[in-house]
Amino acid sequence: MEVTFVKEFTDKSLHIRAMSESGDEMASGTFALKEMRFGGKYITALAVCGLETKPQYRRQGLIRRMMNIGETFGREKGAPIAVLHAFSFDFYRRYGYERVSDTVITSFPIETLGFVPFFGGLVQLTKELVPAFVA
């Protein structure tokens, strides 16, 4: 099956879509340049974002080809490292990625942040302010 990789560029990102001969989107993903603090200074890193393949097109090497395209974009833009928030660490190890940290998502009462300076332009998100975004 013939596959075409459609690439949409901005100055700081690349979105890739793998398309079949019939025009079906088989896989997609985004690679974005982000400024990150690393080793005591800010550097440009390549963020690997939301890679996906439709189930019927898996195991055809589409993600591998998209990773090659995306990582080349990052290198050409001067990004010495790439980062991602993986759904499966084992999946990305085959591409040379290693687990270097964990992220913990937690919630707590806003009152516990009383020690943080308050800037007048900031308001607490409430159901009344943004009902569509708060469950």
Mark where each language-model region is.
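Short coil/turn motifs at secondary-structure junctions
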Residues: K34-M36, Q56, F89
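Long alpha-helical, hydrophobic tracts
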Residues: G70-E76, E128
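Conserved active-site alpha-helix within GNAT-family acetyltransferase domains
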Residues: R75-P80, A86-V104
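Amide-forming acyltransferase catalytic core, primarily the GNAT-like/NAT-type
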Residues: T103-A135
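Conserved acetyl-CoA-binding loop-helix of GNAT-fold acetyltransferases
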Residues: G50-T53, R59-T72
